[in-house]
């Protein structure tokens, strides 16, 4: 709803169907097709759909309804799907490090004039495993003003999704683009310098350390990776941010995030049906109720209950 308001404030006409106004027996795709028929539309433009099962359902339903679908590259990722295939071509196994190096070269990110990685090596990961000293206090998170739709949406969630995991008591994140950009800016100014050195650190009862906490915004499109990388590199150059922090952060976005997306689309169907480790037992209830005896795992389980 915040996004709808943003678009309308930019003088863009928006047709918005609220969940509360939809027939519960009607799927999202059903509602879309009904809308298209009402408006007498036979062609639509969409970005790539990342969820493979939903993509299949969506495209089949639109085809059956005789609606032409024009698909455009997703702005939520840097590379096209086909680029992952070409970058992995000739490899017997998928390796993130190989993909990451090609990505750096193709995008000319953190490369010197001789085509070599800035700093003399591709990864500074070995520098990013320090414990947080007792005298170092992680910065406090920004407290964002609640959306004007906050209470309304919470009631909607309780009424429709009460059996889903999680709770509504710890919503720390902003829900609009301005808030997402503010979160990124705060990370760059307050956390970025120490991101690298403490990247793998953990502190008991601390959910947020020196990480950016922008994954939710990248995953729903409030931030796009190309703009995040551009702003990050500009800030790093201007403020002499340590290379292990710069490279480590860049690697998460153009390396791991793009790599796992590529694996999902190329091998996801096979992986979902395979059992590489030959597991035969179910997880016990302790994994879900936070009683395994493994503190980090139990803490995480309790947070999500």
Regions inferred by a protein language model and the residue ranges of each:
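Conserved small/polar residues in nucleotide/adenosyl-binding loops
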Residues: 303-305
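N-terminal beta-strand-loop-alpha-helix module at the start
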Residues: 1-19
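Aromatic-anchored, charged helix-turn/loop surface patch used as a conserved interaction hotspot
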Residues: 251-298
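Glycine/tryptophan-enriched, flexible segments
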Residues: 106-250, 260
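Short His-Asn-centered micro-motif
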Residues: 17-19, 46-49, 72, 220, ...
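Beta-rich, aromatic/charged-enriched effector core domains that present basic-aromatic interfaces
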Residues: 27-173
